[in-house]
């Protein structure tokens, strides 16, 4: 079974997906992390973030691994743990810019679809239910206001001992939302057959839906 969870940055997708993967014993695909790793590699190699061809060539040759360790999934690039590096605001903004290019998305599409070879998969991203896994058995879309997501992000940074500026975080989220929702290639939107949940919806009810044959009352069709 493939379960897709789409939505904007900071809506709680990662928290839900990890809980579901752990509960069901499924593999986890964090597509946002894949784009962040691509962006990190581009920044490290000083690749022009406006050069679609060079970025796509870089994406085609990335060695990315998701490895469960100590209760969380760590992300490795060419054998190096980059889990913390890809969570910086600089990389997040770069990832949103990289993700608008068709050639980059095409280069990373097969890499993402290869995860479906697992017996069960939880796929977290922006276009998992619309583009990458359009035939997924269960599709969810998590959403929340930019303000709520900025508060969540600010708190996450504080908990990690990272200083953050709330106003800057909010502005960057709004800018990223605009790019994600208005890009020509695979814009952020719910799949027609997805169930929609707000950040305030019960995560337990949402998780329950994914492992049952009938939806709970906490979600609505998009």
From Swiss-Prot:
Belongs to the cytidylate kinase family. Type 1 subfamily. HAMAP family: Cytidyl_kinase_type1. CDD domains: CMPK. One of its GO terms (biological process) is nucleobase-containing small molecule interconversion. Its main location: cytoplasm. It comes from the Bacteria. It is found in: Cytoplasm. It catalyses: CMP + ATP = CDP + ADP; dCMP + ATP = dCDP + ADP. GO terms for cellular component: cytosol. Gene3D superfamilies: P-loop containing nucleotide triphosphate hydrolases. This is Cytidylate kinase 2. GO terms for molecular function: (d)CMP kinase activity; ATP binding; CMP kinase activity; dCMP kinase activity. Its EC number is 2.7.4.25. ATP binds at residues 7-15. The keyword Transmembrane does not apply. The keyword Cytoplasm applies.
